[in-house]
Design a protein with these regions (language model features):
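Short, surface-exposed ligand- or partner-binding patches at beta-edge/loop junctions that are enriched
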Residues: 63
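Rhodanese-like catalytic fold shared by cysteine-dependent sulfurtransferases
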Residues: 1-23, 29-60, 68-103
Length: 103
């Protein structure tokens, strides 16, 4: 797979990362974001990421719908010197695990 080098975490690991001070960034579109999101996530659509990098901390959990866009973002952030991981399976895996979404 193209993103084998990108570290990933499962839905059950995200809360611990947030508790440890990691930023959770949701890179989905505005319409996707409006349908439901993880509480505490910061919405920065993928096409705005470069100009909004200063809104992110040094440790970032990236999320999108299924994990492909967020894997690209995590790969980019890691190349920029940040520590980034991808939520494997994205928001769908989160919801499938029975975890809550905000609307």
């Amino acid at each position: 797979m193209l993103f084998d080098d990108v570290p990933s975490v499962g839905p059950s690991e995200v809360s611990a990362k947030i508790s440890d001070g990691w930023t959770l960034v949701d890179v989905r579109t505005d319409d996707e974001w409006a349908m439901g999101r993880i509480a505490g996530s910061r919405h920065i659509p993928m096409d705005q990421l470069v100009e909004r990098l200063d809104e992110l901390g040094d440790q970032v959990v990236c999320v999108c719908a299924v994990g492909a866009r967020s894997a690209r973002v995590a790969q980019y952030l890691n190349a920029q010197g940040r520590e980034a991981v991808n939520l494997d399976g994205g928001i769908y895996a989160w919801a499938e695990a029975g975890l809550p979404l905000q609307t």
